[in-house]
From Swiss-Prot:
InterPro entries: CBR-like, Cbr1-like_FAD-bd_dom, FAD-bd_FR_type, Flavoprot_Pyr_Nucl_cyt_Rdtase, FNR_nucleotide-bd, OxRdtase_FAD/NAD-bd, Riboflavin_synthase-like_b-brl. Its main location: mitochondrion. The chain crosses the membrane at residues 15-38. It comes from Scheffersomyces stipitis (strain ATCC 58785 / CBS 6054 / NBRC 10063 / NRRL Y-11545). This is NADH-cytochrome b5 reductase 2.
Length: 298
């Protein structure tokens, strides 16, 4: 029976007053709900094909080839609209009229209002990374999205291992940050992160702060190719022997996430075929008995 028919029948009975009160209550609930929704932060990015130009607020060096950039969202109270873990597409038009489009993962909190942060490494011959590095404050860059890579749910797994290299740290950092900011999420996190030198370890200050604050939940091991005398981490690549000793056992309660340059994928998990095709699992993880279901490649 529909609500309108039920209401009509009751309106002619001795229950008019209670029903009227209920109707008032319903109207009040509707108003309150609408007010609550209206008070939610507006989202700068809602999906679809619309490109949004964001103004660069600041840009500073993290290393000799990597910058931290902060862009201004359209309104000061806007949040990005992204979830963990997702990315935005970026676009600029060359002098000859060609579109250059590349994906980038923000490193800022999904609830951060007014601005959005990126860590971008400049690659030799990289059109977008070179363009972004040349941007000056008040310049704009076009963005579109979000595009969800893996939607994190609290306590999805008992433990996760994150294997990364270079700027592949960005979605892995998203995961660590999202998990540790939620006291109800008890997921155990291990990060194994490789860089060329100690100075090339990106957002190390932020990573170390999270590990120190959540020392019973987060474990981080850094690897560098070239170490100096003061280096206290691991030297060399992330080997199969290291993974065998430090990864959780294969199983549905554990998940491994991989993100980094092509040599890392080749050695650890095998490459993706495309953004929507994870490809076969090969490399160290396959040799250690993990299956495709145990591993996600960003």
């Amino acid at each position: 029976m529909s609500f309108s028919r039920s209401f009509s029948r009751l309106a002619s009975s001795k229950f008019v007053l209670p029903v009227a009160a209920a109707a008032v209550g319903l109207a009040s609930y509707s108003f309150t709900s609408s007010s609550f929704i209206a008070n939610e932060p507006s989202k700068a990015f809602k999906g679809g094909d619309e490109w949004i130009d964001l103004k660069l607020i600041s840009s500073h060096d993290l290393s000799h080839d990597t910058k931290h950039l902060v862009f201004e969202l359209p309104n000061k109270d806007d949040v990005s609209g992204l979830v963990t873990a997702s990315l935005l597409m970026t676009k600029f038009v060359t002098p000859k009229g060609s579109n250059v489009i590349r994906p980038y993962t923000p490193v800022s909190d999904t609830e951060q209002a007014g601005t959005i942060d990126f860590v971008v490494k400049k690659y030799e011959g990289g059109k977008m990374s070179s363009h972004i590095h040349d941007l000056k404050p008040n310049d704009t860059l076009s963005f579109k999205g979000p595009f969800v890579k893996w939607k994190w749910e609290p306590n999805q797994f008992k433990s996760i291992a994150l294997i990364g290299g270079g700027t592949g740290i960005t979605p892995l950092y998203q995961l660590i940050h999202e998990i540790t900011k939620n006291p109800a999420d008890k997921t155990q996190v291990s990060l194994f992160y490789g860089s060329q030198t100690p100075d090339d370890i990106l957002i190390k200050k932020e990573l170390d702060a999270l590990a120190a604050k959540h020392k019973d939940q987060v474990k981080i091991v850094y690897f560098v190719d070239k170490a100096d005398a003061s280096w206290k981490g691991e030297t060399g690549y992330i080997s199969k022997e290291f993974l065998q000793k430090n990864l959780p056992a294969p199983g549905p309660d554990n998940k491994i996430f991989v993100c980094g340059p092509p040599p890392l994928y080749k050695a650890v998990s095998g490459p993706k075929v495309s953004p929507t095709d994870q490809g076969e699992l090969t490399g160290s993880l396959a040799e250690l008995g993990f299956s495709k279901e145990n591993v996600f490649k960003f």
